C-alpha cells in the first residue's frame, strides 16, 4: 500500500507543482433516479445535504482544499439549480492566477448532435476546452458522493508508481459490490482485473465478505486520456463509459494503479471509519443526514482544517419561541439552519434546512426537512423526508401508520416516508 510520506518534502514540492497543472473534471449530469421525487427538478449533485450544503460542495471543496484550482463541472440533467448554486457560491477563485470553475453543460458540441451518452463521452465532447487548458493530468470525479479526500496524496501515489491511470478504491461489503466497478490488484496495487457492476463480484483475498470497489475517481496522464477518448468515440460497440469501457480496456496494456481511499481520506481525531457515502437512495440519504445529528457523527462538519465551502444565503439566525408547558419551542439532538423558526413546537433528532417554519404544537422526530418548508400546526412528522418548499397542512400525521403512509406517499422498505408537494395535492391538501 502506498505510503504518502515516504519521499518527504521532495514529493510535496513536486506534487504541489503538478496539482497546479492538473485539471479536475466533475461529472455532475446524473439524475439520481433512486432518489425518487427529490430529483424530479434537480440533478442529484444539487440536492441539499447536511443542513446548508449541496452534495456537489463536498467534491468541489476537496478540490479547493487539495490545491486544485482549475475545475470543470459537466452538467446535463435539469441543471439550472446546480448552475445557479455554483455561480452564486463558488465565484471566489482568481482568474488572474489561472484559477477557475468552468460550467460545461451538454451542448451537442460534436458531430451527430448528441447529448452526453456516457461518462467518457461527456469528457470527449469537451476535449477542445480541455486541450486549451493544457493539463499534465486530468482528475475525473463524480459530483454525487459525500466524502473528504486529499487528491494531492492520490496524485503523489500516481507519480510515485509511474502510473498511466490511477483508480481510487474502497472496500465494500460483498453483497453491495454489484453496484460498483470491482477490481483485483497484485502485491504492488497494480490493477489486474476490473469488472463494472458484476453479477458475481470477486471477493478480496483473505476477506471473503469484502470486495475492492472503484470510487469513480480517476487520474489520467492527459495525453493518454485524449488518445483513449478519440478511439472510444469511433467505436460502435462501446457504451462510452469510464467504468464499463475505458478502464477495463487498459488493465492489460497499461499501468493501472489502485489507490486506497484510506491513504488520502481526511479524518478527524477519534473518527471511527473512513467516511464515503453514496446517498443515492431515499434510505441512504435519510441515514446520512440523521447521523449528523448524533453526538459524534461519522462525518465531521466542524473541522476548520478541511472546510466545506458553499453558497451562504443571507439568512437570520434560527429562532425558538414560546416556553409554556404545552407550547415550548425547542430542538434536541438536531441541526437547525439559519432562517428557521421553531414556534412552540418540539424537534428531536432531526435536520432542518434553511428557512423552515415549524408551527405551534407540532412534533418533528427523526426527520429531514428540506429548505423553505412550512409545517402547519399540530402536525406530527416522524421518520420522513419533506421535500423543498412543501406546505405541510395542519394536523398531518406521517410515520405512525405504515399502511396509510404507503397509500399516500412513497415509503421505503426501511420505513422512511417521502413527503412531496405533488403527493399532497393528490390528497387535496
Curated annotation (Swiss-Prot):
Q: Write down the CDD domains for this protein, in alphabetical order.
A: ADP_Glucose_PP, LbH_G1P_AT_C
* Subunit and partners: Homotetramer.
Catalytic activity annotated for this protein? alpha-D-glucose 1-phosphate + ATP + H(+) = ADP-alpha-D-glucose + diphosphate
* One Pfam family in the UniProt entry: NTP_transferase
The record's EC number reads 2.7.7.27
Q: What class of enzyme is it?
A: transferase
Q: What is this protein called?
A: Glucose-1-phosphate adenylyltransferase
Entry binding sites for alpha-D-glucose 1-phosphate: 116, 181, 196-197, 214
Natural source organism: Paramagnetospirillum magneticum (strain ATCC 700264 / AMB-1)
- Which processes are annotated in GO (biological process)? glycogen biosynthetic process
Q: Which pathway is it part of?
A: Glycan biosynthesis; glycogen biosynthesis
Keyword list (alphabetical) reads:
ATP-binding, Carbohydrate metabolism, Glycogen biosynthesis, Glycogen metabolism, Nucleotide-binding, Nucleotidyltransferase, Transferase
A GO MF term: ATP binding
Its biological function? Involved in the biosynthesis of ADP-glucose, a building block required for the elongation reactions to produce glycogen. Catalyzes the reaction between ATP and alpha-D-glucose 1-phosphate (G1P) to produce pyrophosphate and ADP-Glc.
Q: What does the similarity note say?
A: Belongs to the bacterial/plant glucose-1-phosphate adenylyltransferase family.
Amino acid at each position: 500500500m502506498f505510503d504518502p510520506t515516504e519521499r518527504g518534502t521532495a514529493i510535496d514540492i513536486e506534487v504541489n507543482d503538478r496539482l497546479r497543472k492538473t485539471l479536475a473534471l466533475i461529472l455532475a449530469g446524473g439524475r439520481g433516479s433512486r432518489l425518487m421525487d427529490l430529483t424530479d427538478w434537480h440533478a442529484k449533485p444539487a440536492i441539499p445535504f447536511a443542513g446548508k450544503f449541496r452534495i456537489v460542495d463536498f467534491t468541489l471543496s476537496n478540490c479547493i482544499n487539495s490545491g486544485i484550482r482549475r475545475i470543470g463541472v459537466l452538467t446535463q440533467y435539469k441543471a439550472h439549480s446546480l448552475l445557479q448554486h455554483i455561480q452564486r457560491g463558488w465565484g471566489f477563485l482568481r482568474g488572474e492566477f489561472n484559477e477557475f470553475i468552468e460550467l460545461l453543460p451538454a451542448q451537442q458540441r460534436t458531430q451527430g448532435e448528441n447529448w452526453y451518452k456516457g461518462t467518457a463521452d461527456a469528457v470527449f465532447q469537451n476535449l477542445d476546452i480541455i486541450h486549451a487548458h493544457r493539463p499534465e493530468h486530468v482528475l475525473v470525479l463524480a459530483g454525487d458522493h459525500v466524502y473528504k479526500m486529499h487528491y494531492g496524496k492520490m496524485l503523489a501515489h500516481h507519480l510515485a508508481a509511474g502510473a498511466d491511470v490511477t483508480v481510487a478504491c474502497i472496500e465494500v461489503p460483498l453483497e453491495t459490490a454489484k453496484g460498483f466497478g470491482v477490481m483485483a490488484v497484485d502485491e504492488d496495487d497494480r490493477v489486474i482485473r476490473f469488472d463494472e457492476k458484476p453479477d458475481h463480484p470477486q471477493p478480496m483475498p483473505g476477506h471473503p465478505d469484502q470486495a475492492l470497489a472503484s470510487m469513480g475517481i480517476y487520474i489520467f496522464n492527459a495525453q493518454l486520456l485524449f488518445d483513449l477518448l478519440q478511439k472510444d468515440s469511433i467505436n460502435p460497440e462501446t457504451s462510452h463509459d469510464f467504468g464499463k469501457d475505458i478502464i477495463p480496456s487498459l488493465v492489460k496494456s497499461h499501468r493501472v494503479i489502485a489507490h486506497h481511499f484510506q491513504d488520502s481520506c481526511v479524518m478527524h481525531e477519534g473518527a471511527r471509519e473512513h467516511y464515503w457515502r453514496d446517498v443515492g437512495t431515499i434510505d441512504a440519504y435519510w441515514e446520512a443526514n440523521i447521523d449528523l445529528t448524533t453526538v459524534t457523527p461519522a462525518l465531521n462538519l466542524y473541522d476548520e482544517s478541511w472546510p466545506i465551502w458553499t453558497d451562504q444565503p443571507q439568512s437570520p439566525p434560527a429562532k425558538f419561541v414560546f416556553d409554556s408547558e404545552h407550547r415550548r419551542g425547542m430542538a434536541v439532538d438536531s441541526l437547525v439552519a439559519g432562517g428557521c423558526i421553531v414556534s412552540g413546537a418540539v424537534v428531536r433528532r432531526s435536520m432542518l434546512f434553511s428557512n423552515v417554519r415549524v408551527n405551534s404544537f407540532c412534533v418533528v422526530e427523526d426527520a429531514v426537512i428540506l429548505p423553505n418548508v412550512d409545517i402547519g400546526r399540530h402536525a406530527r412528522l416522524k421518520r420522513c423526508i419533506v421535500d423543498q418548499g412543501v406546505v405541510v397542512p395542519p394536523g398531518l400525521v406521517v410515520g405512525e401508520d405504515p399502511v396509510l403512509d404507503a397509500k399516500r406517499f412513497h415509503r421505503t422498505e426501511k420505513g422512511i416516508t417521502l413527503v412531496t408537494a405533488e403527493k399532497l395535492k393528490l390528497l387535496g391538501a
